């Protein structure tokens, strides 16, 4: 569960770091949003370094959690209710993440 929580925080940092420039570029918000965006992306990169598995495995598994968090963001921030297919796809991605991260390994 600790790994999943770290993935959630990592995904949130990445989404915030990408959403703030989106607000500036697409919604005409202040250019100053780029400052917290850069900080959020730096935190995102640091958080990735805290994951205990090999980098390639972490990046592959992280993608599943990112999809889940992006769907939550769609609902919570954009105000768009996820479709059944959004939820099914997110669930499949989370199953993939669990297989990648928690499968038994000899190495």
Swiss-Prot record:
Superkingdom: Bacteria
Subcellular location: Cell inner membrane
Keywords, sorted A to Z: Cell inner membrane, Cell membrane, Membrane, Transmembrane, Transmembrane helix
Residue spans crossing the bilayer: 3-23, 30-50, 60-80, 84-104
InterPro entries attached to this UniProt entry: UPF0060
GO cellular component terms attached to this protein's record: plasma membrane
Annotated membrane topology: Multi-pass membrane protein
SUPFAM superfamilies, A to Z: Multidrug resistance efflux transporter EmrE
Disulfide bond entries: none
HAMAP family: UPF0060
Family to which the UniProt record says this protein belongs: Belongs to the UPF0060 family.
Descriptive protein name: UPF0060 membrane protein PSHAa1175
Organism annotation: Pseudoalteromonas translucida (strain TAC 125)
